A protein has these predicted regions:
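Phosphate-binding glycine-rich loops and adjacent basic patches that engage nucleotide phosphates
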Residues: 28-34, 48-61, 96-108, 127, ...
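Acidic/His metal-coordination segments adjacent to aromatic residues that form catalytic metal sites
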Residues: 40-58, 113-130
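Primarily short, surface-exposed interaction patches in extracytoplasmic proteins
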Residues: 1, 22-26, 75-81, 86-95, ...
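Short charge-dense sequence patches
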Residues: 22, 41-47, 88-93, 206
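Active-site core of glycosidic bond-cleaving carbohydrate-active enzymes
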Residues: 1-28, 32, 55, 59-76, ...
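Acidic/histidine-rich catalytic neighborhood
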Residues: 92-147
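Glycine- and aromatic-rich loop/turn segments at beta-sheet edges
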Residues: 27-41, 99-116, 173-184
C-alpha cells in the first residue's frame, strides 16, 4: 500500500492485476472449503499456488487486503473507470468474508473462528474473535458496500446485518483488549505478546469503529 500512500497510486494499480491472474485459484480454495467468493492466499508462488505451511492456510488477515488496496486506488482516482476495473473482485472478496463469519444464535452476533490470528501464536481450532481480524472485517465490509453504491448497486442487506452484529473486541477486567476472545491470559502468557502487535493494529492501522470502546 505504500505506493498509494506516498503519492504513487499508479504503481499500486499495476500490481493489483496479480489478483485477477490468481482469481481462479482463490475461488477454488473457497469452493473446496465450502465458502463463497474467493479466499486470498497468504503465501504463494507467482501463479497463486499456496506454499507449504501449517500456519499460512489458516490465516485470514490478508483476506481484506484487496478491498483496502482497491480503495486506495479509488481515493487517488475516484472514477467510474476504477470502479469498473476492481468492483468485481471487491465483491467476490466480501462474499468470502461474509460466508466465513459464523452467526452465534445464542448471543445474537457474528463471530470469526477457525483461523490463526495475525500474530500466529494461537491455534485455529480454539481461537474466537481475534481483534485485528474483527476490525479489518468491519472496515472492509463497509467499504465493499460503498463500492456497491458507487457502482449503482443496492447495498447487500445480509452484509449490513453482519456489519451491525459483528462481535465487539473482547477485553479483560482491566479494560485491556485481548489477543482473542478466548485468550484470557493475554497479558500473562508470552505467546500472546511476543509477535505481531495485533491489538494495536485494530485501531492503529485501521480506523476507529464501533467494535472498539470510545472510552
Amino acid at each position: 500500500s505504500w505506493q498509494a500512500l506516498w503519492g504513487h497510486p499508479e504503481l499500486l494499480d499495476r500490481t493489483l492485476g496479480w489478483y485477477e491472474t490468481v482469481e481462479p485459484v482463490a475461488r477454488e480454495i473457497a469452493r473446496r472449503q465450502g465458502f463463497d467468493g474467493v479466499r486470498w492466499m497468504k503465501m504463494t508462488d507467482p501463479s497463486g499456488t499456496e506454499a507449504p505451511s501449517n500456519v499460512g492456510s489458516f490465516l485470514i488477515w490478508q483476506q481484506p487486503h484487496f478491498i483496502y488496496l482497491a480503495e486506495l486506488v479509488y481515493r487517488a482516482n475516484p472514477s467510474d473507470e476504477v470502479i469498473k476495473k476492481y468492483n468485481h473482485l471487491v465483491q467476490e472478496t466480501a462474499k468470502f468474508m461474509y460466508s466465513f463469519a459464523t452467526y452465534d444464535d445464542f448471543h445474537g452476533r457474528f463471530i470469526l473462528k477457525g483461523a490463526i490470528p495475525a500474530q500466529e501464536t494461537l491455534r485455529a481450532a480454539t481461537t474466537i474473535n481475534p481483534p485485528f481480524e474483527l476490525s479489518y472485517w468491519h472496515y472492509a465490509m463497509n467499504v465493499a458496500q460503498q463500492w456497491r453504491e458507487r457502482a449503482g448497486e443496492k447495498r447487500n442487506l445480509e452484509w449490513d446485518e453482519m456489519i451491525d452484529k459483528l462481535s465487539p473486541l473482547a477485553y479483560n477486567e482491566d479494560s485491556l483488549y485481548l489477543a482473542a476472545e478466548n485468550a484470557v491470559d493475554t497479558y500473562k502468557d508470552i505467546r500472546f505478546t511476543s509477535d505481531h502487535m495485533a491489538v494495536l493494529g485494530s485501531v492503529g492501522i485501521l480506523p476507529m469503529n464501533k467494535l472498539i470502546r470510545a472510552d
